[in-house]
Amino acid sequence: MGGAGLTSRARLVKGVTAVVAAVLASMGLASATGADPVIGGKTVLKPDRDTFEGLADMSIGVEATGAATFRRSGAKFPIKGGDVKGGPKGSIEHRGGLAFFTEGGPGVKFSKFTIRIGKRKVKLFAKSGRSEVRFLDLDLGDATIGGSEGVKLRIKGADAGLAKQGAEVLSDVFDFPFRKGIPVGVVNVKAQLG
């Protein structure tokens, strides 16, 4: 009899748990993080003219790779996923990347960009070779952040500088002392949430 009572109680707890989960899901509170999935959009990097002219003077070219494209407005990277919550905080994943190269000489590719928005810092990570490296640091100090909660996120005018790991990779490949903080350009993000 005690076993039957325990089974009934277990079923009751299981049933109540399922009802609570359904209610939370209908309220959009099922996720512990309260984050909205990122379902599309684009990020554009408008190159820093002085830095890219300096690269050209060193005979280092830069081109978009994969799904990324280079236009007059800058390099465009399609957004493929991620999660973002209020603040904003979260991550935004991209397709495509950038290749740095010399004609007939060494080169390196940074791809699969992920922007990670933290409480105090915003970092752009990329795959280089078989490793993930912190490629750029983004400064939101002078940026404009807007959008509609749960619908879209807009970040306009984030200054992008070369991160320490990104500088180390470029230094190793091109045998030149690239330094952390070199201006790379201005980043604009238009992310669709769903």
Model-derived regions, located:
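Generic alpha-helix signal with a bias toward terminal, lower-confidence helices
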Residues: 18, 24, 28, 57, ...
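N-terminal segment immediately downstream of the Sec signal-peptide cleavage site
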Residues: 32-89, 159-194
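Secretory targeting and sorting signals
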Residues: 2-33
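Predominantly extracellular/secreted and cell-surface proteins with exposed
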Residues: 65-134
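Extended amphipathic ligand-handling, pore-lining, and cofactor/metal-binding catalytic surfaces
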Residues: 132-165
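Poly-acidic low-complexity segments
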Residues: 46-48, 116, 139
